[in-house]
């Protein structure tokens, strides 16, 4: 009989069915560029830059911005931010620029234009009679791009968090080398009138392009990145969390994965490390693949690698990290099992370290140390195995390594120890938990066991 089927009786009649559930219909798309063409968008007719500035500033003062006009202006303003390419710049086989070339953000992408005119109407506020300076253009570009960052701030952030961010951004763009062009709180007022800037594809594309440029090229106006930095590794929270995790526990990626004792990690690890991507290449298009429209559904997001994401943040919770306690649990990816493994891995790496002497007063002291260490190794290798010291180590929790951790889990029947539960409760109960966060999950799951 088919191993996928189950059998049962209905009204004394034997029934055999194959249980099938809804599967994810969306395919993860990897961002590798295979046609050797730069990312591109199409915008309306290029405007007169000064006329566009006056129109956009007028619209910002009136909290009425036309997204198409904003995008057209941001693309046209790229010519103002010329810099020098520090090294040969290539990504996915595409030559972006040579070392020493004069480049602008527009060099990184292909911006196509149609003959369709923008609105460019003065919609309110004071009309500017003179032409704006480069500093004023830079301020307007910075403020507009900051709408992207504000629209990405989650509603879970309490209090005046978003308002405080907007105020700090305004302060940046009213001091040198920028120039003050709007009154206080204008940015936040404009954001409230249209809070979904991060969902506008062309605006997101331009924000990512500016960020990619200013992250590589030293420039007087690099602070514009304050509004665009969130486009870097966007929808990569799974991969970013894994990168932070291995740095936190001081292991290589290969060494860390050896601790992932669950079958559901297999597909996610394969997905995260798909060959042909530029995950480790500095200044690659990969870093901004989401904003540049190179992937519809990211294979590196927390939802795409939910088991990995859950495990990493349960370990982070065990270690008392605020970021992990505040992160959102991926409820469809075995959070109970991941919390068990997270407890054991937290115990493995929390409050312990691997230390050795690396610096010496002179060469003789170094040689003496190496000789002594070599003797210790020889003695260890000569163990006649009459005493199985490993058993005691497994129970005491002193032996380090994936084999030892796995053995401890098996000896405890795949359940958390009381010490793990006490630690989880200790870190989560003293934290003001957000809805659906890891802190809330730990409180609800283990508080009755404390």
Swiss-Prot record:
Gene3D superfamilies: Nucleoprotein, Rhabdovirus nucleocapsid protein like domain
MF terms (GO), sorted A to Z: RNA binding
Post-translational modification: Phosphorylated by host CK2. Unphosphorylated protein N seems to have a better affinity for leader viral promoter encapsidation. Phosphorylation of protein N in ribonucleocapsid may stabilize the interaction with protein P, thereby playing an important role in viral transcription/replication.
Annotated family: Belongs to the lyssavirus nucleocapsid protein family.
Keywords: Capsid protein, Helical capsid protein, Host cytoplasm, Phosphoprotein, Ribonucleoprotein, RNA-binding, Superantigen, Viral nucleoprotein, Virion
Transmembrane annotation, as ranges: none
Localization terms from the record: Virion; Host cytoplasm
Entry function: Encapsidates the genome in a ratio of one protein N per nine ribonucleotides, protecting it from nucleases. If expressed without protein P it binds non-specifically RNA and therefore can bind it's own mRNA. Interaction with protein P abolishes any non-specific RNA binding, and prevents phosphorylation. The soluble N-P complex encapsidates specifically the genomic RNA, with protein N protecting the genome like a pearl necklace. The encapsidated genomic RNA is termed the nucleocapsid (NC) and serves as template for viral transcription and replication.
Modified residue annotations for Phosphoserine: 389
Principal subcellular localization: virion
Any single Pfam family the record assigns to this protein: Rhabdo_ncap
Gene Ontology CC: one annotated term: helical viral capsid
Protein name: Nucleoprotein
Further facts: Displays a superantigen activity in human and mouse, activating mostly V-beta-8 subtypes of T-cell receptor.
Subunit description: Homomultimerizes to form the nucleocapsid. Binds to viral genomic RNA. In nucleocapsid, binds protein P and thereby positions the polymerase on the template. Protein P acts as a chaperone on free protein N to prevent it from aggregation before encapsidating genomic RNA.
């Amino acid at each position: 009989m088919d191993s996928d089927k189950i059998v049962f009786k209905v009204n004394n009649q034997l029934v055999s069915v194959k249980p099938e559930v809804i599967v994810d219909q969306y395919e993860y798309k990897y961002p590798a560029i295979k046609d050797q063409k730069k990312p591109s968008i199409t915008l309306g007719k290029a405007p007169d830059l000064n006329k566009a500035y006056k129109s956009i500033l007028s619209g910002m003062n009136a909290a009425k911005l036309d997204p198409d006009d904003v995008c057209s202006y941001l693309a046209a303003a790229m010519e103002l931010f010329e810099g020098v390419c520090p090294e040969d710049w290539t990504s996915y086989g595409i030559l972006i620029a040579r070392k020493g070339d004069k480049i602008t953000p527009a060099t990184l992408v292909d911006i196509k234009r149609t003959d369709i005119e923008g609105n460019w109407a003065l919609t309110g506020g004071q009309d500017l009679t003179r032409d704006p300076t480069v500093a004023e253009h830079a301020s307007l570009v910075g403020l507009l791009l900051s709408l992207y960052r504000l629209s990405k701030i989650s509603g879970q952030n309490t209090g005046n968090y978003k308002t405080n961010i907007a105020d700090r951004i305004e302060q940046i763009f009213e001091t040198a080398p920028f120039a003050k062009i709007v009154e206080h709180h204008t940015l936040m007022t404009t954001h409230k009138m249209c809070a979904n800037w991060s969902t506008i594809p062309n605006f997101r594309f331009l924000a990512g392009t500016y960020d990619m440029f200013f992250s590589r090229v030293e420039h007087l106006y690099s602070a514009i990145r304050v509004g665009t930095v969130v486009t870097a590794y966007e929808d990569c929270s799974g991969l970013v969390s894994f990168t932070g995790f291995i740095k936190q526990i001081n292991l290589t990626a290969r060494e860390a994965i050896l601790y992932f004792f669950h079958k559901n990690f297999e597909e996610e690890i394969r997905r995260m490390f798909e060959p042909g991507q530029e995950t480790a290449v500095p200044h690659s298009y990969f870093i901004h693949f989401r904003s540049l429209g190179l992937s519809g559904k990211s294979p590196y997001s927390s939802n795409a690698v939910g088991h990995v994401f859950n495990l990493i943040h349960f370990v982070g919770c065990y270690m008392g990290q605020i970021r992990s306690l505040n992160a959102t649990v991926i409820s469809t990816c075995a959070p109970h099992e991941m919390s068990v493994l997270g407890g054991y891995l937290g115990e493995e790496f929390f409050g312990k370290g691997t230390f050795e002497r690396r610096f010496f007063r002179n060469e003789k002291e170094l040689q003496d140390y190496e000789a002594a260490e070599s003797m210790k190794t020889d003695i260890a290798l000569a163990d006649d195995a009459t005493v199985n010291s490993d058993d005691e180590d497994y129970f005491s929790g002193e032996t380090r390594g994936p084999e030892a951790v796995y053995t401890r889990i098996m000896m405890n029947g795949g359940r958390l120890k009381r010490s793990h539960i006490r630690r989880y409760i200790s870190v989560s109960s003293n934290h003001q938990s957000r809805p659906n966060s890891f802190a809330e999950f730990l409180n609800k799951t283990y508080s009755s066991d404390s």
